[in-house]
């Protein structure tokens, strides 16, 4: 059986597709204090450290793994982009049970901007990190 990413027999675009974008490696979350952010994301959200090493100036390159996702998260603010800290990121995390996850995270001190709400597509909530960056927590 052929899957959605398998080349079709006789497909003239097979070679070209093999050079195209295949995955997302990481997204960056702008933070003011990398150590405080690292503690929040690992102790409260349960993310794992993939890389933590010196990078540029006083900053470190901190990359975190999230569950089974192949996409990592970096806690990094490029110089000159400090205005991005504390914004709505557009990043959405998935939980099997949004309400149970909301209760667990709230008990750990995670601040929720919006409590779980039933939508036509599922359940969602919005939470913030210590810098005010906002994220959606949604059902699969």
Where on the chain are the PLM-derived regions?
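Intrinsically disordered, low-complexity segments enriched in serine/proline and basic residues
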Residues: 4-5
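N-terminal beta-strand motif that seeds the catalytic metal site of vicinal oxygen chelate
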Residues: 11-38, 88-91
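Core segments of cupin and vicinal oxygen chelate
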Residues: 28-71
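Vicinal oxygen chelate
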Residues: 31-35, 86, 90-134
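A short beta-turn/loop motif at secondary-structure boundaries
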Residues: 54-56, 82, 118-119
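Active-site beta-strand termini and strand-to-loop segments that position acidic
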Residues: 64-68, 127-130, 139-140
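Short, charged/polar surface micro-motifs in flexible loops or helix N-caps
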Residues: 67-72, 80-82, 97-100
